[in-house]
Amino acid sequence: MAKDGPRIIVKMESTAGTGFYYTTTKNRRNTQAKMELRKYDPVAKKHVVFKEKKV
């Protein structure tokens, strides 16, 4: 069974449509809104915006 705490695992999916994603954790008490980060997508070979999706 999963650990019930303030930190949850989230999937950051590329908006370039390549299907590439990162997994990271976030504190659900401090960061309640969906995260958006600009990270490198090796499939697209450039920096793109990654949006939070459910795992």
UniProtKB/Swiss-Prot annotation:
Q: Can the keyword Transmembrane helix be found in this entry's annotation?
A: no
Which PROSITE patterns is this protein grouped with? Answer: RIBOSOMAL_L33
Alphabetically sorted, this entry's keywords are: Ribonucleoprotein, Ribosomal protein
Q: Which domain of life is it from?
A: Bacteria
Q: Name one Pfam family in it.
A: Ribosomal_L33
Q: Which GO terms of type biological process are on file?
A: translation
Q: Which Gene3D superfamilies match?
A: Ribosomal protein L33 (2.20.28.120)
Task: List the GO terms this entry assigns under cellular component, sorted alphabetically.
Answer: cytosolic large ribosomal subunit
The GO molecular function terms of this record are:
structural constituent of ribosome
Please give the HAMAP family that the UniProt record associates with this protein.
Answer: Ribosomal_bL33
Q: Family per UniProt? A: Belongs to the bacterial ribosomal protein bL33 family.
Annotated PANTHER family: 54S RIBOSOMAL PROTEIN L39, MITOCHONDRIAL, LARGE RIBOSOMAL SUBUNIT PROTEIN BL33M
Q: What is this protein called?
A: Large ribosomal subunit protein bL33
State the species of origin: Deinococcus deserti (strain DSM 17065 / CIP 109153 / LMG 22923 / VCD115)
- As recorded in Swiss-Prot or TrEMBL, the protein's gene is named rpmG
